[in-house]
Amino acid sequence: GLGDVYKRQGYIGGGLYHSQNIEGALTTLPGARIVCPSFADDAAGLLRTSMRSKGFTLFLEPKALYNSVEAAAVVPEDFEVPFGKARIRREGTDLSIITYGNTTHFCLHVAEQLEKESGWKVEVIDIRSLIPLDKEAIFESVKKTSKALVVHEDKVFSGFGAELAAMIGTDTVSYTHLRAHETSAHL
């Protein structure tokens, strides 16, 4: 049979405030897979994977990306994106930005600007899948750059980004002098 897929969006009549991002709470649900695409091809691929898998998937759709030219992408036929596989959106050696959803596009612009203005080569990791999480991709990037910035729209306190920053700070201490920072749209 097909997997259970629950989509959460609010294109019309959705929330006005960032405090209504609830991925931090959703990631505590046992057995749930939670995805949040940033681009159209990933949305199509993750949706296909969700429908073809057993168990249930919470599919978070950032409504700001619905008509976004930046999020547009050619979607190959029968394209699937595996759960728990992050995508390096931009290679870099000076800073790792770990992000997902709407903030991926913002981070790509910031990375480009930092390179133009200061020569910094910023790596942007789009995690795409919150649960399961591609810890290996995150750790490899942070190991390479020794600096991490987690950017998300959820709340700072108890938001999913806080968990990412804590994980990075705890699990990368053996190979870097890292101090992880987190920023969100809701302070």
Regions found by a protein language model. Give the residues of each.
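Conserved thiamine diphosphate
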Residues: 7-53
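Thiamine diphosphate
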Residues: 11, 63-179
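Short, small-residue-biased leader/transition segments that mark boundaries at the very start
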Residues: 1-6, 180-183, 187
